């Protein structure tokens, strides 16, 4: 335990998320890389949210919810670093609802000032049996008792 990491080639932990990743500036998914996946991992889940939105909109804003990212030996030959969205990731991957009322990635869009965005990656001991319309709360509830390890990456973005 302890080697499970989530990083990005586009920004350092705590650094500035590139402009083109912003919701109104291209909405491009940042490149994310996973390393040190625990051996007993059956699937991975990713949640990106904005806790700083609480002050502006009264809740933590959900930007991305992804689950059933498969640990595939062809994709991860030696548990080395691998892109999160590799062409070999299977059709089991699901994207849930964001607070933009859509599925998939919704980039940073702070309404008032610089916000810190949190990417949380979970190594799970099972797949999650959820529909595509599932929310962050649904995923968090389904993960209860199945989390092996968690990795976190933060980035900032200003309007």
Region spans (language model):
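N-terminus-centered regions that define maturation/targeting leaders and the start
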Residues: 1-159
């Amino acid at each position: 335990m302890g080697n499970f990491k989530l990083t990005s080639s586009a920004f350092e932990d705590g650094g500035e998320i590139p402009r083109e990743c912003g919701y109104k500036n291209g909405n491009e998914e940042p490149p994310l890389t996973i390393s040190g996946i625990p051996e007993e991992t059956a699937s991975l889940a990713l949640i990106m949210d904005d806790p700083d939105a609480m002050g502006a909109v009264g809740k933590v804003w959900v930007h991305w919810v992804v689950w059933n990212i498969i640990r595939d030996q062809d994709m991860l030959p030696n548990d080395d670093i691998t892109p999160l969205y590799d062409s070999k990731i299977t059709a089991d991957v699901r994207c849930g609802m964001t607070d933009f009322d859509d599925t998939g990635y919704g980039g940073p869009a702070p309404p008032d000032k610089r916000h810190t965005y949190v990417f949380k990656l979970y190594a799970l001991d099972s797949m999650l049996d959820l529909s595509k319309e599932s929310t962050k709360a649904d995923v968090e509830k389904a993960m209860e008792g199945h989390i092996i390890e968690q990795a976190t990456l933060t980035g900032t973005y200003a309007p």
